Design a protein with these regions (language model features):
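A cytosolic small-molecule/anion-sensing beta-strand core signal
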Residues: 45, 63-64, 85, 107
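Cyclic-nucleotide recognition modules
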Residues: 80-135
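Phosphate-/nucleic-acid-contacting segments
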Residues: 154-201
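Short, Lys/Arg-enriched N-terminal segment that forms or immediately precedes the first helix
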Residues: 89, 139-150
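Glycine- and acidic-residue-biased ligand/ion/polar-headgroup-sensing regions
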Residues: 57-70, 86-87
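Short beta-strand segments in beta-sandwich/barrel cores
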Residues: 49, 66-71, 110-111
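Conserved short histidine dyad/triad with adjacent acidic residue
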Residues: 40-55, 74-76, 84-87
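Cyclic nucleotide-binding regulatory module and flanking cytosolic helices
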Residues: 1-46
């Protein structure tokens, strides 16, 4: 069964709804195990990008690795919407057409890809799975909305310290320009923040 037990090597806590023991127990049912193992998966090398194209209803489950959702802002500059480590759902950024954003692997990664039709197939097999998946997706969306609101109230240095506290593994895996984009600063500003925190000046 393709379910990672080593679920958050990048330091970020796993999805609070997606307890691995629960899914493993549920997939003890042969039909559900075949369903889950039969869902399409995509392997991405570090730096490789993947676009959902016209499939706006696509959602992904990150099995291994660390991914970023990347989009272009109104000025055409690339921005990182969020990072997604293993054992997290990855959903489209709100308000963006499917063709306007992409998924980019920060390290070698594997993601499971699912659309509305496949979610409905889960409902036919076991309504609990369908309800659980929807609950997990809503929880992930809410988490990202809360983070966006929180980011607006934080200074760039406070955002960096938040990442350092919650997901220190990102700092070794994510290229500086991607981390700077996520924090809403330039590469130079991020270097200054790091130097100031290191030296105290």
């Amino acid at each position: 069964m393709n379910y990672p037990l080593e679920i958050h090597p990048a330091g970020q806590a796993p999805c609070t709804v997606c307890e691995p023991g629960w899914l493993i127990s549920l997939c003890a049912d042969v039909r559900m195990r075949h369903y889950w193992d039969g869902l399409p998966r995509i392997n991405l090398a570090a730096g490789q990008a993947w676009c959902t194209g016209a499939e706006s209803d696509t959602v992904c489950w990150v099995e291994t690795g660390l991914l970023a959702t990347v989009f272009a802002d109104a000025q055409g500059r690339e921005r990182v919407h969020h990072f997604h480590s293993a054992a997290h759902w990855l959903t489209p950024p709100f308000g963006l057409p499917a063709q306007d954003w992409r998924i980019e692997a920060q390290v070698p990664s594997r993601l499971l890809v699912m659309n509305d039709l496949q979610l409905e197939e889960a409902k036919v097999l076991d309504k609990r799975v369908h309800d659980w998946m929807l609950q997990a997706l809503m929880a992930e969306r809410q988490r990202l909305i809360q983070r966006e609101h929180q980011w607006l109230m934080f200074s760039a240095a406070e955002r960096y310290l938040k990442v350092l506290q919650e997901a220190p593994g990102w700092l070794e895996l994510v290229p500086q320009h991607r981390l700077a984009s996520y924090l809403g600063v330039t590469d130079v500003a991020l270097s200054r923040i790091r130097r100031r925190l290191k030296t105290g000046h």
